[in-house]
């Protein structure tokens, strides 16, 4: 009985690790980039901004915070970050974060600060915000986890990518290939 339980735990841990690291990805376009409502995102342009991606993220997501450290190291990219909280606490924090900024630059500053400092909080000012719509959009298009990255060419990766894998994916060679 004890060996069976240990085996079951090991199988479950392996499955969780696979989900957390590889998740799902597509190296063939299938997502229609034009379906994205870019005005509902927080935009950042780094370098020449030639490579364009959308990232569905949430301030309470541990893998999203880890992914932000990876995104810091990527150059020549335009990143559209869509706040897509998956639980009520993250929903409130996402709305507070969105409403605390009066423009894209302030929202970007607050988001990056929140990703590096879990204690960062923002005033609970109410405002019109796209957060609920981002969640509905995610459900409609089967974006069920954060972070999820979509390339302008329609390729999609759900889950965290280390820097080398992200760079490989951005170059069109596939996230997990040689």
Identify the role of each PLM range.
Residues 5-88, 123-145, 165-178:
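Extracytoplasmic thiol/disulfide redox context detector
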Residues 90-167:
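Thiol/selenol-based redox catalytic cores and closely related redox-interacting motifs
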């Amino acid at each position: 009985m004890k060996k069976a339980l240990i085996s079951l735990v090991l199988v479950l841990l392996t499955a969780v690790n696979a989900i957390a690291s590889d998740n799902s990805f597509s190296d063939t376009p299938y997502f229609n980039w034009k379906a994205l409502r870019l005005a509902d995102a927080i935009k950042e342009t780094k370098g020449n901004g030639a490579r364009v991606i959308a990232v569905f993220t949430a301030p309470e997501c541990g893998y999203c915070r880890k992914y932000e450290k990876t995104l810091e190291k990527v150059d020549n990219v335009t990143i559209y970050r869509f706040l897509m909280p998956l639980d009520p606490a993250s929903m409130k924090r996402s709305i507070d974060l969105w409403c605390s900024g009066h423009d894209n630059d302030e929202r970007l500053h607050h988001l990056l600060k929140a990703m590096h400092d879990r204690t960062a909080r923002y005033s609970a000012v109410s405002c019109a915000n796209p957060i609920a719509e981002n969640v509905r959009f995610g459900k409609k298009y089967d974006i069920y986890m954060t972070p999820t990255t979509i390339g302008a060419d329609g390729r999609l990766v759900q889950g965290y990518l280390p820097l080398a894998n992200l760079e490989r994916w951005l170059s069109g060679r596939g996230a997990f290939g040689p």
